[in-house]
Amino acid sequence: MFVFLQLQKRPEVRVANGCKSLIINNLKRKEMITNCCPAATALPTVPSETCAQNFGQIQKIIFQRIMNGSTKNSIADGTSAGNAGLLASWTALKTANDDTKIAVSPFIEAPADDGGDARTFGGGNDTLNGIEIIIGSNPVNFSCRLNGKKQDIIAELKKLMCESQANNLGVFLVNENGNIEGIKDGGSWYPIPVQKLFVGDKMHGNWDGPDYNNMSFSFVPGYSDKLDVLVLDASALAL
């Protein structure tokens, strides 16, 4: 009997400012197990806080492919025609027939995050002074419920799992005010990369509650470093 092993290409490793990062399917994943040596000339400058930022309740999710061919999908900031500040720009993307197309979830409920804590090694006699070493960060995991939804809607959402398996799926989040949360870099908005999207089969609520489907995915470590909130000219909940 012959056994054939498929060798996968190792992720590309880049080094900048003494810190390693992995390039996986065109996605940059920051690694906290950094060899930050030599040290920077001075400590970083932390911006002064002018006002708090809290996004609120996530009520809809906008899915989009991360890559548009060989370039990243992006929407220019601003309120000119086709720019991110106009609801019409997002509405047009719903009917696109290429990599720029967006798919919008129905209303979701019970949104919750967990994880995001440090991955550590050691403690006790294994490390100096018994202090654990931080070797990375666990992903932030997102979960929600789709209550009382027709299963033809769920069947279409399940197709997005294939996009996730290809590491080519991102999301924009929509809150109760119709604002959008995404990655803002320079003058453009980008979808937040996610992995491990799962859309579950129908669960019957029977006497005590509505029927529902579970949905979940994971953000990659460092996903929120350039996260920002976009206020449109009209509520994105209308998408």
Regions found by a protein language model. Name each.
Residues 115-188:
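Structured, beta-strand-rich domain cores
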Residues 66, 147-151, 174-177, 210, ...:
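Generic structural motif
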Residues 31, 88-95, 155, 159, ...:
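Polar/charged alpha-helical tracts
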Residues 33-143, 192-210:
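Solvent-exposed edge beta-strands and adjacent loop segments
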Residues 15, 32-33, 47, 158:
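Secretory pathway export signals and precursors
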Residues 19, 36-37, 144, 162:
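Generic recognition of cysteine residues
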Residues 1-31:
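N-terminal amphipathic/basic-hydrophobic helices that include classical n-h-c signal peptides
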Residues 188-239:
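Mixed-charge, glycine-accented linear interaction segment located at domain edges/termini
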